[in-house]
A protein has these predicted regions:
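A glycine-rich, Thr/Ser-enriched phosphate-binding loop motif common to dinucleotide/cofactor-binding enzymes
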Residues: 15, 19-29
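Adenosine-phosphate binding glycine-rich loop
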Residues: 171-248
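Catalytic-loop motifs flanking and including active-site residues across diverse enzymes
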Residues: 22-23, 58, 214-219
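Short, conserved loop/helix-junction motifs that constitute active-site signature segments
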Residues: 36-37, 67, 166-175, 202-203
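Rossmann-like adenosine-cofactor binding region
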Residues: 92-197
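Glycine-rich phosphate/diphosphate-binding loop of Rossmann-like nucleotide-binding domains
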Residues: 31-134, 138
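Low-acidity, Ser/Thr- and Arg-rich intrinsically disordered low-complexity segments
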Residues: 2-7, 13-18
Length: 248
């Protein structure tokens, strides 16, 4: 059902994108093991933010990774907030290989319906990020300023895309696991209108910090794997040696 190697997407002959976030560790622990993830519904949804240009790594990581666990993944966003098509194709291929489901919708409520996990987070459209990269490469500050103004106006059209108490009631038994990579745009706390209601965020603050606590281990693992040719062998040798670190 699950392939253990890091998630990598060849997005073009000259660029490979690796996404290895702490997401799986958190949900594996929360649901009591990898074997309990199959069939769980995940709602990866766009959410309103008063800022623009947030990265695509989270939605792409979720649809690319969670479909490898046999999970039912729904990607929801307003028209025009598409992620990289190559990553969507990875998700579809994972469905064929691991018996997962991948669905797209322009309805946040549809995605939240009976979901076991919800991940409402803002991101910028992939096309806009491509445009911004070109403008920065050209040193076109006027173009960058115009793009920012346009994207902020685009975001403002979708303020109803927020993780509210009413939206959470649509989830499975009204108790889906709320996830966010942090920091979140919290309505009434960090901003006037944002990704999530203050009451929802506050209720999930403990699991949110547990999720964040896995990041150092993931970073260490990525550094280790980039420096060692055969990481599995090295780890097995260390385990077999049964040596203990000495404190001086």
């Amino acid at each position: 059902m699950f392939s253990p190697e890091p998630f990598a997407v060849m997005v073009a002959p000259s660029r490979t994108m690796f996404i290895v976030p702490p997401l799986p560790l958190h949900v594996i622990h929360y649901f009591g093991g990898v074997e309990n993830l199959k069939g769980k519904k995940v709602a990866m949804t766009w959410a309103y933010s008063p800022s623009y240009g947030k990265p695509l790594s989270v939605p792409q990581g979720v649809i690319g990774l969670f479909t490898r666990f046999g999970m039912d993944v729904t990607l929801a966003h307003p028209e025009g907030y598409d992620v990289m098509p190559e990553v969507e194709e990875v998700a579809r291929k994972n469905c064929e290989k691991y018996g997962s489901k991948f669905h797209k919708t322009n309805s946040m409520a549809e995605a939240f319906k009976d979901a076991d996990i919800v991940y409402p987070k803002s991101w910028a459209p992939f096309a806009a990020m491509e445009e911004r990269t070109k403008l920065y490469s050209a040193g076109d500050q006027a173009g960058i300023d115009a793009l920012e103004k346009r994207l902020l106006a685009q975001n403002a059209e979708h303020k109803d895309w927020a993780c509210t108490e009413e939206m959470m009631k649509l989830t499975k038994d009204g108790k889906a696991l709320y996830m966010h990579c942090l920091p979140a745009d919290i309505t009434g706390l960090s901003c006037k209108e944002g990704e999530v209601d203050n009451s929802v965020f506050d209720r999930y603050i403990v699991p949110l910090y547990k999720e964040a606590s896995y990041k150092p281990y993931i970073i260490a693992a990525m550094i280790f794997m980039s420096q060692v040719k055969d990481p599995v062998k090295v780890l097995m040798d260390l385990d077999a040696a049964d040596s203990h670190r000495k404190l001086h």
